[in-house]
C-alpha cells in the first residue's frame, strides 16, 4: 500500500494521473490530509465515491505512532513516536505568546557523533521517511488543537502573518531534533515542500529552519532546491576544537563551511545565518575563544545563538555558568554581533535532544537481553 503522507503535491499529481484523475484531486487530498487531518478516505466528501474506493484499494494515510506525551512545567511538550524495532524519535513543542515552535526529528539516531549530543551517542539506525517527518507536524497540530496540556495557548493577535494557515498552534518549524537533516536530503526536501505548500501547512520560508552540523555539499543542494532559514551548529571558533566536538569538521572544515554559508545567503529568506554555539564549561566558553569567534564570523551576516548545555548521563560535560555565558555574550555584542542566549526549556522532561528516545532504546535492549549493536525488536 502507498502511504500518501510520503508525497508532496507534485508526486500526488502524478499519482492521481496514474489513477485517471485530474491534477486538482491532488490539491483536494493534500487539504483533507494535512489541513483537515483526515486519514479515512470515505470522510473526504468532495472526492468522487469511485475515486475514494480506488484509494482504499491501493493507498493509506499512515502516521507514526505516539507512544508517550510529556509536558513540562513551563509548557514545553515532548512526544515520543515509535519507529519500530524498539526505537523512537522525539518532537518538541515550545509555546511562546507570539509563536509556537515545533522541533522536528529527521533520523533515528545520528551518524555524526557530536561529543556533547545525546542522540549522537546512540549511533545511527536509519533515516526517517517523509511520512515520519511530516507526520510529526500533522500530529502536533492535531494534539495541540485538542487543547490538552496546553497552559500557554498561542495569542494569534501577536503572530506576524497574513496567512490563516499559520494561525494553527504550530507557527514555526525547526529541523533541530534527532539526526542530521541534510544527511536525509531527499526526504527532508519533500517534507519541506509540504510544510511550505498553501494546500498543506502554508508556512513561510522564514518560519522553517534547517539546522546542520555542516554537510557542505548538501547545504549547496538545499540552496538550489528549497532555501529556507538556516542554522549552523558551529560550537567552536577553530578547527582544532571543532574537530573534537563536531567530528564532521575533519571532512568539511570551518573555512569550507563558512564559504557555503556565504553562498547560501543570496537565496535565503533571511539576510543572515544563525550560528549555534553550545556552552560547555571549561571547554569552549572562555573570553579568549569568544574573541576568536568574533574574528571568524565578523564578515558573515549572522546571529549567534548561545545554547546552555543540557546535561545527560555519561556526557562528560557540564553547562557553563551564567557568568561565563554572560561574559562570552558581551564580547560578541560589543563587536556588533547580534547575540542571544537560548532560554532553557523543559528541564523537567529530559530536555536534552534524544534523551527520552535513548531511554526507550535502552529499556528495550535490557528487556530483550540485548547489548550494543543491532537494535532490539520490541515485543
UniProtKB/Swiss-Prot annotation:
Location within or outside the cell: Cytoplasm
Domain Radical SAM core: 96-348
EC number in record: 2.1.1.192
Residues the record lists as binding S-adenosyl-L-methionine: 179-180, 211, 233-235, 310
Disulfide bonding pattern of the chain: 103-353
GO MF annotations in UniProt: 4 iron, 4 sulfur cluster binding; metal ion binding; rRNA (adenine(2503)-C2-)-methyltransferase activity; rRNA binding; tRNA (adenine(37)-C2)-methyltransferase activity; tRNA binding
Domain of life: Bacteria
BP GO annotations: rRNA base methylation; tRNA methylation
Positions that bind [4Fe-4S] cluster: 110, 114, 117
Keyword field: 4Fe-4S, Cytoplasm, Disulfide bond, Iron, Iron-sulfur, Metal-binding, Methyltransferase, rRNA processing, S-adenosyl-L-methionine, Transferase, tRNA processing
This protein's record includes keyword Repeat: no
Protein family (similarity comment): Belongs to the radical SAM superfamily. RlmN family.
Miscellaneous comment text of the record: Reaction proceeds by a ping-pong mechanism involving intermediate methylation of a conserved cysteine residue.
Entry protein name: Dual-specificity RNA methyltransferase RlmN
Native source species: Nitrosomonas europaea (strain ATCC 19718 / CIP 103999 / KCTC 2705 / NBRC 14298)
Amino acid at each position: 500500500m502507498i502511504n500518501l503522507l510520503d508525497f508532496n503535491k507534485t508526486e500526488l499529481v502524478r499519482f492521481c494521473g496514474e489513477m485517471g484523475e485530474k491534477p486538482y484531486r491532488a490539491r483536494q487530498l493534500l487539504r483533507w490530509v494535512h489541513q483537515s487531518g483526515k486519514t479515512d478516505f470515505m470522510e473526504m466528501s468532495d472526492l468522487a465515491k469511485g475515486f475514494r474506493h480506488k484509494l482504499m484499494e491501493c493507498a493509506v494515510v499512515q502516521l507514526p505512532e505516539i507512544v508517550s506525551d510529556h509536558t513540562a512545567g513551563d509548557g514545553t511538550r515532548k512526544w515520543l513516536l515509535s519507529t519500530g524495532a524498539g526505537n523512537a524519535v522525539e518532537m518538541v513543542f515550545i509555546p511562546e505568546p507570539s509563536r509556537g515552535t515545533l522541533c522536528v526529528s529527521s533520523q533515528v539516531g545520528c551518524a555524526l557523533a557530536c561529543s556533547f549530543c545525546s542522540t549522537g551517542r546512540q549511533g545511527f539506525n536509519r533515516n526517517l521517511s517523509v511520512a515520519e517527518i511530516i507526520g510529526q507536524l500533522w500530529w502536533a497540530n492535531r494534539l495541540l488543537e485538542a487543547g490538552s496540556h496546553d497552559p500557554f495557548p498561542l495569542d494569534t493577535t501577536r503572530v506576524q502573518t497574513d496567512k490563516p494557515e499559520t494561525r494553527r498552534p504550530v507557527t514555526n518549524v525547526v529541523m533541530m531534533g534527532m539526526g542530521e537533516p541534510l544527511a536525509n536530503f531527499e526526504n527532508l526536501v519533500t517534507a519541506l515542500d509540504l510544510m511550505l505548500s498553501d494546500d498543506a501547512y502554508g508556512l513561510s520560508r522564514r518560519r522553517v529552519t534547517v539546522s546542520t552540523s555542516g554537510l557542505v555539499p548538501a547545504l549547496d543542494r538545499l540552496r538550489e532546491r528549497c532555501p529556507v532559514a538556516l542554522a549552523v551548529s558551529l560550537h567552536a571558533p577553530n578547527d582544532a576544537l571543532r574537530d573534537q566536538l563536531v567530528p564532521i569538521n575533519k571532512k568539511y572544515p570551518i573555512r569550507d563551511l563558512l564559504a557555503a554559508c556565504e553562498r547560501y545567503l543570496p537565496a535565503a529568506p533571511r539576510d543572515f545565518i544563525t550560528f549555534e554555539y553550545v556552552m560547555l564549561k571549561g571547554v569552549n566558553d572562555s573570553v579568549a575563544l569568544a574573541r576568536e569567534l568574533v574574528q571568524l564570523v565578523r564578515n558573515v551576516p549572522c546571529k549567534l545563538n548561545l545554547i546552555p548545555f543540557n546535561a545527560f548521563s555519561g556526557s562528560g560535560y557540564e553547562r557553563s555558568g551564567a557568568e561565563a555565558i554572560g561574559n562570552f555574550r558581551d564580547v560578541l555584542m560589543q563587536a556588533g554581533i547580534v547575540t542571544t542566549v537560548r532560554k532553557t526549556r523543559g528541564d523537567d522532561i529530559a530536555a536534552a535532544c534524544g534523551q527520552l528516545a535513548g531511554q526507550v532504546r535502552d529499556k528495550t535492549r535490557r528487556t530483550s537481553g540485548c547489548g550494543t549493536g543491532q537494535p532490539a525488536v520490541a515485543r
